[in-house]
């Protein structure tokens, strides 16, 4: 339904106004921070991995959009830009990260690091210890922008095997069920089960930590969160 609303906008200003309205709706609950995803991918590209736009192009367009609507965000509310594995702010190229933040007009900004999304960019990862090492090294490579990481969405996603063996073609029957199965097979939102999370937290030192996991009910979520929290101490 939300996508239909965007599609009905006939010009740029109407589209930007929808974004402003969404921001105002979020601000109504007095948040400490807002999260903004920086990525671009159409339905075909989700399956083929053959992307029309590269990181720099998506970054430049995102800068333009954000600067056009940022005036409605109070200075005391920080905007945390989240990484994805599709073209945009993937965090694996420090130059792209620098290009993005240098282009923003708003000063109170930072990064919401999604561990699963970052893991999805490296299809060679085979276990959790490799993943933690990769995440920490990627963060260190950001230089000064390491300090821009204020929050973390914590989950495990070792989807390299699935991505390697994906048929790279759009299914004939491309239903929402097919789409969601494919996307969630890549972005798995599982818990970490091995030790090593303590070193990850010490490396990043986030002010906000969200256990972003898939679950069927609140009872299951409670168990998953408790399990992952215990690993933070090991």
What is each PLM-predicted segment?
Residues 16, 30, 107-113, 119-234:
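Histidine-acidic metal/acid-base catalytic patches
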Residues 1-6:
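Short, small-residue-biased leader/transition segments that mark boundaries at the very start
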Residues 8-110:
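Active-site acidic/histidine proton-transfer and metal-coordination neighborhood
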Residues 42, 118-119:
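Short, active-site-adjacent cap segments at secondary-structure transitions
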């Amino acid at each position: 339904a939300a996508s239909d609303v965007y599609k009905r906008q006939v010009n740029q200003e109407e589209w930007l106004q929808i974004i402003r309205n969404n921001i105002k709706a979020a601000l109504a609950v007095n948040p400490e921070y807002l999260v903004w995803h920086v990525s671009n991918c159409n339905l075909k590209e989700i399956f083929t991995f053959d992307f029309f736009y590269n990181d720099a192009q998506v970054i430049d367009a995102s800068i333009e959009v954000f600067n056009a609507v940022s005036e409605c965000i109070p200075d005391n509310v920080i905007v945390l830009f989240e990484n994805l594995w599709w073209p945009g702010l993937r965090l694996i190229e420090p130059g792209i990260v620098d290009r993005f933040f240098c282009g923003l007009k708003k000063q109170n900004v930072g990064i919401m690091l999604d561990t699963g999304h970052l893991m999805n960019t490296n299809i060679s990862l085979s276990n959790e210890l490799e993943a933690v090492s990769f995440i920490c090294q990627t963060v260190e490579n950001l230089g000064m922008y390491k300090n821009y990481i204020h929050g973390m969405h914590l989950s495990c996603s070792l989807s390299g095997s699935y991505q390697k063996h994906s048929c790279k073609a759009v299914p004939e029957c491309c239903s929402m069920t097919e789409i969601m199965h494919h996307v969630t097979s890549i972005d798995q939102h599982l818990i970490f089960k091995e030790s090593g999370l303590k070193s990850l937290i010490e490396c990043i030192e986030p002010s906000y930590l969200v256990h972003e996991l898939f679950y069927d009910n609140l009872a299951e979520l409670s168990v998953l969160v408790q399990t992952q929290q215990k690993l933070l101490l090991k």
